[in-house]
């Protein structure tokens, strides 16, 4: 007499064993057309399955929040099936779902091209039209192993050997005659997998180990209906338009090349942006009473061992040898700042010491993870470390929060999300110290009227931290700012100060970053603004274009006038149509285009137009310069409107 419990909390009692089809007809017959899967006790079941014992049943239709992942799991193995149909000798390593889609890793004798993606996509569409049922079977370890050995699928055999006990059953899904290892619940029928798109090809090491073979990864996206798919593809199209790599190349801001992977060659225009950002942070450092320092790029490996960084991050640290000594190319600035603190005796009267650096850091990131300015091997961190007493912690955290919001307000991001990461299981320090420290951080957030989310167990082993996440206009989140308490590093590196009782005391270190990596922040800004940076950050702020040769003398006069007041200006005296020039400089994202013809020359005025296409008409030159200077000096995010 099985008792069937349903996801909505209801239940039904049957006098005898009952098939899932019968249960559906009794409970919710209308769902049959849109039913994509059934979960019995959290496991996939076929419609013809008979239930003989008490069970918990969930019907998953296309409106169910679980439907999307089920469809994506199915599409991942549909892709694997299509690959084997087209290239029988290709070896499927693994497939799975990711945010917004799915992927499949394959070992194939040649590089897969964009044309191949079209071929695979068409094959997948053809398979979907067959509307075949997907079957799930539980078989023995030895049977599963034999199936994949016969198909020469060495990666599947390896996965079974490493992850499944020889006495256990193996769950396989069958797409017609193609068998694959269960990666997640799949649809009953492939007809529910109509709305997908293959997107790109990447490279990944087998098991993420660089000593293993490099595989080719095919990425795709899948959705429950055409509207959602189209919406996502439009979103991706917008992302592509804003891609900082394309915009950076078009605007000649920087480039990267194979001979120096993950390292940036800044061109003049890009370096102007970099320096303007750095100078802006410098203004804030002075305002909040920081001292700027510079520490060496190479520091003996011994220091990194003492600090604990070597044991935790050695795979990401570049090293070099000189005169039988091994040096680390610094991946972060903190140990160097501690050396400055330790270089002379400190009294409690000297504290707090706020030490900031635009430190050039190097990290050996995997080549497959490198991505323009967003993920590099050499970056500049707007890093600071505050050495203070335990009693000064709250005040310093409060000032850090104010400084971060002060600086972020200039860039008008959609939203700033705040997360407080608390103690992990493995940690140093007493519970009372952690209680006090976490309360310090939460109280300061509350005092500043900031809503925040707890990230339980996500703090570092040496202290809790606050993360500041910028949400852009496309709803992407970028973690940039951090405030991190550290009880560990000053102990490891023997830092101390003399307190009022003439005793040695260990200071607390507060790690503080605002932009994080300057390079990455520039990438974020370029994408947020589609390259239309605010005037104060724009490499060229004004361009003067001549209409005829007659006005070229006045153009040169204006060029000098603007240059003399440090406005970044170019002039265009080419013998081209005025419409062509305006379009070209608009595409170059120059904030203001000044048009100079006979009328302007004779009246000693200028016609002004901004890059949005707003025409200000003919105005007085000095008046425009004054307004432009105000926009630049105040670091206004928006252009003048009149």
UniProtKB/Swiss-Prot annotation:
Positions of the TGS domain: 1-61
First-tier enzyme category under EC: ligase
Stored SMART domains: tRNA_SAD
Chain spans, region Catalytic: 243-534
GO biological process: threonyl-tRNA aminoacylation
Cofactor(s) this protein requires: Zn(2+)
InterPro entries referenced in this protein's UniProt entry, alphabetically: aa-tRNA-synt_IIb (IPR002314), aa-tRNA-synth_II (IPR006195), aa-tRNA-synth_II/BPL/LPL (IPR045864), Anticodon-bd (IPR004154), Anticodon-bd_dom_sf (IPR036621), Beta-grasp_dom_sf (IPR012675), TGS (IPR004095), Thr-tRNA-ligase_IIa (IPR002320)
Single GO term (MF): ATP binding
Location (main, coarse): cytoplasm
Subcellular location: Cytoplasm
Catalysed reactions, semicolon-separated: tRNA(Thr) + L-threonine + ATP = L-threonyl-tRNA(Thr) + AMP + diphosphate + H(+)
Details of cofactor binding: Binds 1 zinc ion per subunit.
The EC number(s) this enzyme carries: 6.1.1.3
PANTHER family reported for this sequence: THREONINE--TRNA LIGASE, CHLOROPLASTIC_MITOCHONDRIAL 2, THREONINE-TRNA LIGASE
Stated role: Catalyzes the attachment of threonine to tRNA(Thr) in a two-step reaction: L-threonine is first activated by ATP to form Thr-AMP and then transferred to the acceptor end of tRNA(Thr). Also edits incorrectly charged L-seryl-tRNA(Thr).
Record NCBIfam families: thrS
Recorded family membership: Belongs to the class-II aminoacyl-tRNA synthetase family.
Protein name as catalogued: Threonine--tRNA ligase
Protein's organism: Buchnera aphidicola subsp. Acyrthosiphon pisum (strain APS) (Acyrthosiphon pisum symbiotic bacterium)
Organism taxonomic ancestry: Bacteria, Pseudomonadati, Pseudomonadota, Gammaproteobacteria, Enterobacterales
Name of encoding gene: thrS
């Amino acid at each position: 007499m099985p008792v069937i419990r349903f996801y909505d909390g209801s239940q039904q009692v049957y006098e005898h064993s009952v098939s899932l089809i019968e249960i559906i007809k009794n409970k919710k017959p209308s769902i049959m057309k849109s039913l994509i899967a059934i979960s019995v006790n959290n496991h996939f079941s076929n419609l013809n399955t008979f239930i003989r014992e008490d069970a918990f049943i969930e019907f998953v239709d296309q409106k169910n929040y679980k439907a999307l992942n089920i469809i994506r799991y199915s599409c991942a193995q549909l892709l694997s099936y299509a690959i084997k149909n087209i290239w029988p000798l290709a070896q499927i390593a693994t497939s799975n779902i990711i945010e917004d889609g799915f992927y499949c890793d394959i070992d194939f004798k040649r590089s897969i091209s964009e044309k191949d993606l079209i071929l695979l996509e068409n094959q997948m569409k053809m398979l979907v039209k067959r509307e075949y049922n997907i079957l799930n079977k539980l078989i023995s370890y030895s049977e599963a192993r034999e199936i994949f050995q016969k198909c020469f699928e060495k990666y599947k055999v390896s996965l079974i050997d490493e992850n499944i006990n020889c006495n256990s059953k193996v769950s396989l899904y069958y797409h017609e005659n193609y068998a694959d290892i269960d990666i997640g619940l799949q649809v009953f029928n492939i007809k529910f997998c109509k709305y997908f798109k293959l997107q790109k090809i990447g490279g990944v090491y087998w098991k993420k180990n660089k000593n293993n073979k490099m595989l080719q990864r095919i990425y795709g996206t899948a959705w429950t209906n055409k509207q959602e798919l189209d919406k996502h593809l439009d979103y991706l199209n917008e992302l592509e338009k804003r891609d900082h790599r394309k915009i950076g190349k078009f605007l000649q801001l920087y480039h990267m090349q194979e001979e120096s992977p993950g390292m940036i060659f800044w061109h003049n225009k890009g370096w102007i942006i970099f320096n303007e950002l750095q100078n802006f942070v410098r203004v804030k450092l002075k305002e909040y009473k920081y001292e700027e320092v510079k520490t060496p790029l190479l520091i003996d490996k011994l220091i990194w061992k003492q600090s604990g960084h070597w044991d935790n991050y050695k795979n990401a640290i570049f090293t070099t040898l000189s005169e039988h000594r091994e040096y680390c190319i610094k991946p972060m600035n903190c140990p160097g700042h501690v050396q400055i603190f330790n270089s002379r005796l400190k009294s409690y009267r000297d504290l707090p010491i706020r030490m900031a650096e635009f430190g050039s850091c190097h990290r050996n990131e995997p080549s497959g993870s490198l991505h323009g300015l967003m993920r590099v091997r050499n970056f500049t961190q707007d890093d600071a470390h505050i050495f203070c007493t335990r009693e000064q912690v709250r005040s310093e955290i409060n000032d850090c929060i104010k400084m971060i919001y002060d600086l972020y307000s200039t860039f008008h991001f959609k939203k700033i999300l705040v997360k407080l990461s608390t103690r992990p299981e493995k940690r140093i320090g007493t519970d009372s110290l952690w209680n006090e420290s976490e309360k310090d951080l939460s109280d300061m957030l509350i005092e500043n009227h900031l809503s925040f989310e707890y990230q339980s167990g996500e703090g570092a082993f040496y202290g809790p931290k606050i993360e500041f996440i910028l949400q852009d206009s496309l709803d992407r989140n970028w973690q940039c700012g951090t405030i991190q308490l550290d009880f560990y590093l000053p102990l490891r590196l023997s830092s101390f100060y003399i307190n009022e009782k003439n005793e040695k005391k260990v200071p607390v270190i507060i790690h503080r970053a605002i932009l994080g990596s300057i390079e990455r922040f520039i990438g974020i800004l370029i994408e947020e603004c589609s390259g239309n940076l605010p005037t104060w950050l724009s490499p060229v702020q004004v361009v003067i274009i001549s209409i005829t040769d007659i006005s070229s003398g006045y153009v040169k006069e204006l060029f000098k006038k603007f240059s003399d007041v440090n406005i970044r200006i170019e002039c265009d005296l080419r013998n081209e149509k005025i419409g062509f020039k305006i379009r070209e400089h608009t595409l170059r994202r120059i904030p203001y285009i000044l048009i100079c013809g006979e009328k302007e020359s004779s009246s000693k005025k200028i016609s002004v137009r901004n890059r949005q296409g707003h025409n200000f008409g003919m105005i007085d030159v000095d008046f425009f310069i004054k307004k432009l200077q105000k926009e630049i000096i105040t670091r206004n995010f928006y252009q003048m409107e009149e």
